[in-house]
Every structure is written in C-alpha cells, then in structure tokens.
Curated annotation (Swiss-Prot):
Keywords: Aminoacyl-tRNA synthetase, ATP-binding, Cytoplasm, Ligase, Nucleotide-binding, Protein biosynthesis. It is an enzyme of class 6 (ligase). It catalyses: tRNA(Arg) + L-arginine + ATP = L-arginyl-tRNA(Arg) + AMP + diphosphate. Belongs to the class-I aminoacyl-tRNA synthetase family. This is Arginine--tRNA ligase. It comes from Rippkaea orientalis (strain PCC 8801 / RF-1) (Cyanothece sp. (strain PCC 8801)). GO terms for molecular function: arginine-tRNA ligase activity; ATP binding. The gene is argS. It holds the Pfam family tRNA-synt_1d.
C-alpha cells in the first residue's frame, strides 16, 4: 500500500520535472504533514530550498510547481502560504478509499523495506554473576522495540545478547568458591543468583586486598583460557545459573534474544591483534598495544589511544568488540549493525568503529550505528537507586510495578462496584504494570534522562500505557455492547467520512506506515508512542462527537469499521513496543 506521503512525493517529482527539467527528478520535494492543520494536511517545502539554485523567489517557484502539479483524485487545489510553503488538503473521498484498503490489509498498510537487509541488533548484555539492574532496562526494551520495528518492515533481524561471560572476574570467583563453597563448582543449582552476587562481592574484596589470592585467581583464568575441563565446567555452571535468572526477566518483559557472549569471540582475539599489527596500526604505550586515533584526547589534551592488548598480554572489551564486529560482518553477513547501550559508552564505540574502519574491517556497504540512551533517574533527579544507595534490581522494580498496578485496579473496581475473578485481577495487574514500565521508558526521547515514577506511569490519563490500553479496551466494549463481530463486518461496506472528527481520525490512521518508517530511520521509539497517544485522543474525540451504535446505516457500519481499524492500529503499534492489549480492564 502506497502511503499518502509517498503518493504526494511522486506527484511533486513529476511536477518538478515538467516545470524545471529532467535533472530535477532526483530532488526530494520535502513533503511532510502540515505544521498547521488550518492550512491543510500536508505541505511541500521544496520551493524554499530551490530558490538559490533557480535564482527566483520561493513563491514564484511554488506557483510554477502548482501549475504543473496533478493530484488526480487525491487532494484539493494546492495553496501557497508564507514564504513559499505548498499546502495540500486531502479529499475525504480519497481518505475513505485508502482507509478501506488499509482495513483489508493484514499488515494495516505498513510497507516493507526496499531493500530488505540483514540487521543485527545488539542489546541488553548483562554480566554473568551479577543481577540485572535498572541500568539494563533501557537497553533491553529499546533494543527489543527497534528489532520489532525492523522485523515488521521485513528485514532479517538477528537479536544478539553480548553477555559478559569472560574475563578476570571468573578466575576470581572460581578461586574464591573453591575455598568457601566448592560444591558450587560441581553441582548445578547449588547457588541462586543472590548467593552468586554475594560471593562475587566477597571475591572482589579479597582480590583487592590479598596479593596471594590475586595470583590464585589469575592462575584460574589461565586454566580457563587453556580449556582445563574442571575449570571450564565450573565456569559453565556459573554462567548457567545467571542465564536462568536472566531468562526470568526476559520472560516477564517478553524479550526474544540470542545469547552470544564475550567468550564466543575469545578464539578470535589473537588474530585481531595480528591483523592490526600487520596493517601498521599498533603502537606500544607503557607496555600495552594501542591504536592512536584522530580526535580523541584526554583532559590534558594528550592523544587518547584505544588499548587493544594490555601490558600483561591480556585482552579487553575493545579487542572483543573488534572481533565481534568482524565476525558479524564476515560470518553473519550483516549489512547493518545496531548497538543499543547507555550514552556513557559513546566514546568507546566511536573509537572501536574508527579502528575497525582504519583496519578495513567495516566495508563501505555496511552501516554501523550506536544507539545511545540517557539515565533513569529517581524523583529526586538523581540516578535511580534504593534508599540505602544501592542499584535497584530490575526484578524488584518490575515486581513493584505489578503491585502498584494491582492496588490501582482493586481501588477502581471497588469504586465501580465491580466483582472480578482473581485470574482477571492478576492478569490485568501484570499486563498493566509491566506495560507501564515499558511505555514510560519508550515514550521518552531515548537520548534524554527521565524521571521514574510509578504514579505517573500508571495514570489512566496522559501519555501512558494504561491510557492506551484503556482506549483499546473501550473499543472492544463497543463490540460487546452492540454484539458486533468486527471480523465479520461487511468487507464490501464503504467508509463514509462526514464529520470533522471522523475525517481527522481517518487521516491519522493513514499515517501509521509513515511513522513506522520514520522510527526505522531515526531509531527513536518515542515517535511511535507519540503517534499512538495522538491516535487515542483523536479516537476519543470521534467517539464523543459521532454516535456509533445509534447511527443509521450505512453510517453505523462505516463508523464501526473506523473503530475496528483504530483498535487494530493500536494493537499493532503497542505490539511493536512489546505491549500486549487487554479486552477488558
């Protein structure tokens, strides 16, 4: 299904060619939704950008474009506003025809990308022997949303979890457990994640204070890297214990992801160093192998290198990231690789990507993107922590959201005098609580910090998950009240747009595909949230002003079709955010 924006763009390109010649066939006419609805539905800003090139006034250029523009049955006669904006008002009859096409489309008119690409989205990436905390929330749900958007656009998406499952910390932990709890190194389920975290902290304290223990820990690392069967088995047990706990979180959040941890790339690290050395990129600095890069300096202004091999011969995150990048390009054959991490890692990835380009690891046809995000803050404006100052565990944060959602639901049921089953209450509380956390995060521009507030995210008014879920449930109540089966509504029935609020709703429904394309380009999920929120508001205005069940035919069926299309659009949009819908709330 061709979107209105695409159709208008094609018409304007044809007009540009007619007015100014074939060399203008590649120029973007810059068609966007109108900034002020009173002037129209869409506007083209091309006349202003062509003024210098053509040496004419923008309004004169705009008039020449209009003189050569044929909109067929799509829009009214265009008008010129301000310095040269071309405004177009879409005809209600055209809107109705397009809405019917969207109604009959299983994808609701969402277009597939062209070309289809192999894309890797690297997100979540917790560390073994540590619990997932609030800091993992944003990477996990932003990465999942981006993957869902790319998938609905038809791309081949590989979701990768680059878990921290390798390094000195394992030698430290294994050495410590061998002393205090050797069963944990031979028996599955001997520890839960809480025990593992406690032992890790104790091992770290011992490592920092005891030089002899440091040597023991390093020997364990050497044995692990050499493939010693006993040490490797202990490492696998520790990884599996953490992995089970991670999966509990992923199940709660409905996250599908393929684990490929740092250890996977360990056999490739030596070759990465050789490759960088062969290309003359390595320089020794204080015994470490480094790559010096343009544009990176420390606070004193001295060159800041990327260390790829430590002075003791060990490797680090940068080495692993370079090996992972090469593997993803050569073996996974990715054409686009997206890294979703906090903004604090922006400098690291900028260095890694620059080294990879210098080493010719990244071909010109492969796009590498870092998607940074800001902090989650408490209502005091500081980084979100517990009252004692420790990092909040993600599981605790999610559980508390469900508890708050249940309290709100039970209060509302009491006020309404409704009796519901325990299964209903538990299910609605779970969906609303988890959805509220997700939506509160995704509705923010990811580059910004945001304030985490259960009260705000669980509110039934405003740009929140409960408001969206309630809008969907309200439409389902219409079908129950009128005993309507939306799926069996007359397929050939026409959509009739008469009232201003139903015209506005119809126009907005047709922007779905454009919004999803925009999110793919910008990787900003909040744009989809904004669209769904505005759609919900437009539906509510339509419902308040346009009788549905009490209307006479054919208006009754037409308005029911608009209700159905709105519900399906909300359901699809929320699913791309990882949020399920509720038939009743």
């Amino acid at each position: 299904m061709t979107s209105i924006n695409e159709q208008l763009t094609n018409y304007f390109i044809q007009a540009l060619v007619k007015a100014f010649g074939a060399e203008f066939s590649d120029i973007d006419p810059i068609v966007v939704p109108a900034s002020n609805p009173k002037f129209g539905d869409y506007q083209a800003n091309i006349a202003l950008s062509l003024a210098k090139k053509l040496g004419e006034q923008p309004r004169a250029i705009a008039q020449k474009i209009i003189d050569n523009l044929s909109l067929e049955d799509l829009g009214e006669l265009p008008t010129i506003a301000g310095p040269g904006f071309i405004n177009i008002k879409i005809k209600p009859t055209y809107l109705a025809t397009q809405l019917k096409v969207q109604q009959n489309s299983s994808s609701l008119g969402v277009t597939k990308a062209d070309p289809i690409e192999k894309i890797i989205v690297d997100f979540s990436s917790p560390n073994i022997a540590k619990e997932m905390h609030v800091g993992h929330l944003r990477s996990t749900i932003i990465g999942d949303c981006i993957a869902r958007i790319l998938e609905v656009r038809g791309h081949q998406v590989l979701r990768l979890n680059h878990v921290g499952d390798w390094g000195t910390q394992f030698g430290m932990l294994i050495a410590y457990l061998a002393e205090v709890y050797p069963d944990a190194l031979t028996t599955a389920d001997a520890l839960d994640i809480g025990d593992l975290v406690t032992f890790y902290k104790q091992a770290k304290k011992r490592f920092d204070e005891d030089e002899k223990f440091q040597e023991t820990a390093r020997n364990q690392v050497v044995k692990l890297q050499a493939g010693d069967s006993q040490t490797r088995h202990a490492w696998q047990l520790l990884c599996e214990q953490s992995r089970r706990e991670f999966q509990v979180i992923y199940d709660i959040l409905d996250i599908n992801i393929t684990e490929r941890g740092e250890s996977f790339y360990n056999p490739l690290l030596e070759d990465i160093i050789k490759e960088l050395d062969h290309q003359g990129l390595l320089k020794k600095d204080a015994g470490a192998q480094c790559v010096f890069l343009d544009g990176f300096t420390n606070k004193s202004g001295d060159p800041l290198p990327l260390i790829v091999q430590k002075s003791d011969g060990g490797y680090n995150y940068a080495t692993t990231d370079l090996a992972a990048l090469k593997y993803r390009i050569t073996q996974d054959q990715a054409e686009r690789i997206i890294y979703v991490t906090d903004a604090g890692q922006a400098n690291h990835f900028a260095q890694v990507f620059q080294v990879a380009k210098k080493a010719h690891i990244i071909p010109k046809n492969v796009e590498i993107i870092h998607v940074p995000f800001g902090l989650v803050k408490g209502e005091d404006g500081k980084k979100l922590k517990t009252r004692s100052g420790t990092t909040i565990k993600l599981r605790d944060l999610l559980d508390e959201a469900v508890i708050y959602a249940r309290q709100d639901l039970e209060k509302r049921l009491a006020e309404e005098g409704r009796q519901e089953s325990e299964d209903f209450i538990a299910n609605v509380s779970q969906v609303v609580g988890i959805s509220a956390v997700k939506y509160a995060d995704l509705s923010q521009n990811r580059t910004s910090d945001y304030i985490f507030s259960y009260d705000k995210m669980l509110a039934l008014q405003g740009n929140t998950a409960p408001y969206m879920l309630y809008a969907y449930a309200r439409i389902q109540s219409i079908s129950r009240e009128g005993n309507i089966d939306f799926e069996s509504l007359q397929q050939e029935a026409k959509i009739i747009l008469q009232e201003e609020t139903e015209i506005e709703l119809g126009k907005y429904l047709l922007q779905l595909s454009e919004v999803i394309e925009e999110v793919e380009k910008t990787l900003l999920p909040n744009r989809l949230c904004d669209y769904l929120y505005e759609l919900s508001k437009k539906f509510n205005r339509f419902y308040e002003n346009c009788p549905v069940l009490k209307s006479e035919e054919p208006l009754r069926t037409s308005r029911l079709l608009l209700c159905d299309l709105t519900a399906r659009t909300l359901k699809l949009g929320l699913s791309l955010l990882g949020i399920p819908v509720l038939e009743r709330m």
